[in-house]
Amino acid sequence: MRRSVAVIGSVAAFLLLCSAQPFQPVPKLYRAKPEDVLPWAEQGNFRFIRLDGGQIESWKAERTWWGEKFSSNEKEVLSHIYDREFEQMLGLLKQADFNWIWVTWSNGWSFKDEEENRENLKKVIARCHENGIHVSAYLSASNMFRKSAFRDDPETKKYGLWMHHIPLFYAGPTKTDLQISWDRRLADTRKPGWRAYLLKKAELAVDAGVDAIAWDNMIGYNDGLAQLLDDTQRMAERKARETGRPKVMVYANVHIPPDRFAMNDINEVIWEEDGKDTPGVWDGHWLVDNARKIKFLSGEKQLWQPLMYENDLYHCGPRELCIPSPAEQKLSIAEAYAFGAATSRNIEGRFLHGLIKGEPEAQEAWNAIAQYNRFLAENKNLYHQTEPAARIALLSAEPHNPLADEFLRQSIFFETKVLAHLDKGAPLDRFKVLVMPADLPKFSAEQKARLNAFAAGGGVIINAGKAGPGIAARAEDAAGGPRLSLEPRGYVLGQLTRKPDGRTFILHLLNYNHQAPAENVKVRLELSGLVDPGEAKDLSRWDVKVLSPDAAQPKFAGLSVHENVCEFTLSRIEHYTVVTLSARPAP
């Protein structure tokens, strides 16, 4: 028996890393289209939060490692968040200016056991729509609670996932801390009967009025999972034709590794939960992992696909068991939006219970979220239809890239080009400089051709080698701008974006030190290479404004605008400050 468990564990661990199976999309699979992203779902137009819940979610938590420590009171709130607690929750969502949530539609129980939850959610969806909140339906792609499913839907017995003649069960969270959930049998999406079974559940969600379908537990064989997404999109198109409603969007938890990410070409939306710590300064270490990963994800996806990014671990612990501080909540939101994503957040467990019961720790965190969401809603133009202004690209093969961390901490304006997806993200010819780290794998013929074309078009390629120091300055010199100088730098970094017409630039400044504001920061922003000298010979005809969710009227002094340089001093950056430079209309 012990040997069998060990074998099952090793196979389950393999499936946890199913991104090790490279995915190559085949021509017959559905391709998502930008016109199917409705205006409210475009990047910068939404504030998203997960609202996992219902009796079926409480049952699931009891049978999985992340929910085993929930108290009876936490499980009670979770069970009733879609019925007796929902009106209070709706008020909280409105208070915090959320306009997009997801709900637990189906997570692996039988049709019969999920029926009450579906009926509750029909009312939830209607109430959300009445209040301007859009709703995604969460479904599990591979999970079966076998006692329930096998009893009520006996055909599911035929759909189990096997490997080396061993039945596979849900396991996690990591290979080194592997806990097998024996109640959660995994299904094989390659089997048409299983996909048809899931599509019946997804179609019921569309009939209930949801705006999107979100697939989780994308575990197993890539060809079957991709076919499930394809089937979902075909169903969504059919329902749109039949009802006249907009087509529901589709997205899935594919994860960040580039070998499998191309599956997202089938989806309109990108949702990822690859954050492993909260942004900040921890024991003297300046953590910019999330900003780096968001840049990597932006290099993997289509430019038009909205991106939602979530931490499955916070600095205080697992997301279900702790509540990050107000300062951490604020910086997480600001970081995501500054770098072109939206924050996703799982409040299931400790946080949800604290909100419903009015606990001060939860209320303070929620108030911080509401404060920043209001700023985002009132200043959508800072995040909607914007693009990075960088002229430096950094080539990365994997999400982890120490050079990216160095560039971020030095406020080098750059974007990530992902080696396996050079056709995605910002086009390579938009950049002047491409920095290549030393540890890249061997290039394919297609990759070589793209890089050669970049160089032939006047692009500068810098091989970083092992000599990291000095690379940033070389890249900035070769790019010729833009460039940012902060004095004192402290733990502040900057990101520069712009409107597509080039007449508005947006400088995002984030202070990663939760304990102390950055004070009297001298800012020098050079926009060489970006301001069109034929239209505005210098910045003297540009308006400069400073905004912050932390202060009604942020103070700045010593404004000097000349040629392509803007200089000023910010008296205080508590967590997040935005500076806009806008060209005045010609007289």
Predicted regions: what they are:
Residues 12-25:
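Bacterial Sec-dependent signal peptides at the C-terminal "C-region" and cleavage site
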Residues 26, 199, 226-247, 255-257, ...:
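Carbohydrate-binding surfaces of carbohydrate-active enzymes
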Residues 47-54, 101-103, 135-137, 213-215, ...:
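Hydrophobic faces of well-ordered beta-strands that scaffold small-molecule active sites
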Residues 47-82, 103-118, 179-196, 218-226, ...:
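The substrate-binding groove and active-site-proximal loops of carbohydrate-active enzymes
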Residues 64-83, 121, 137-208:
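Active-site-adjacent "subsite" loops/lids of carbohydrate-active enzymes
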Residues 78-107, 204-211, 332-343, 410:
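Catalytic domains of carbohydrate-active enzymes, especially glycoside hydrolases
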Residues 89-97, 123-131, 261-264, 291-301:
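Acidic (Asp/Glu)-rich catalytic clusters
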Residues 89-90, 103-143, 224-235:
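Aromatic-lined substrate-binding rim segments of carbohydrate-active enzymes
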